[in-house]
Amino acid sequence: LKRFLRFIQPEDMRTEREKDIWDLKKLDIPIQENPIYKTETLDFTVILQEGLREEVKQAIFLHIKYEKIATVKRELTSIRKFSGYLVEKGVKINSCADVDRDLLEEYLIHINTNGSSGRGNSDDILKLRAVLESVGKLYGYSHLESLFINTDIPPEVQPVFRSYSDAELM
């Protein structure tokens, strides 16, 4: 059924970077990927704000050139979560230029109190930071480059190793 629907659809003449779902083979840049976990597409439709989506596409295209595709997918996931949060809270923004420190702090409180793990949260924050800083550099939104402070990223919980004597093990 999918093949039939694709067959009857008119061919999309836009460049791959203009589309909301990128076919990585059509980007004409080398992709650093894991051969076991094949990634063929990147889906930007999960970013619900149109202007935000277009800005993020440019940043992600830049990142694809220098980072492994798994890292880029993780960045896209962090932006998707941020976009979902904006919709959930009814925050109306259409550009990364509208993201300010107050909004970021509300989001940080949300992700740190929703019950998910600390490791995932710190990785999400790092990836969100990378994308927003890239958008800031590409579009001249200088406030995005200094939006995050070091204490925004929760420290990873370090495991405590303990040694046991033979007597304790028996």
What are these language model-derived features?
Residues 160-170:
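Short, intrinsically disordered, charge-balanced linker/junction segments flanking boundaries
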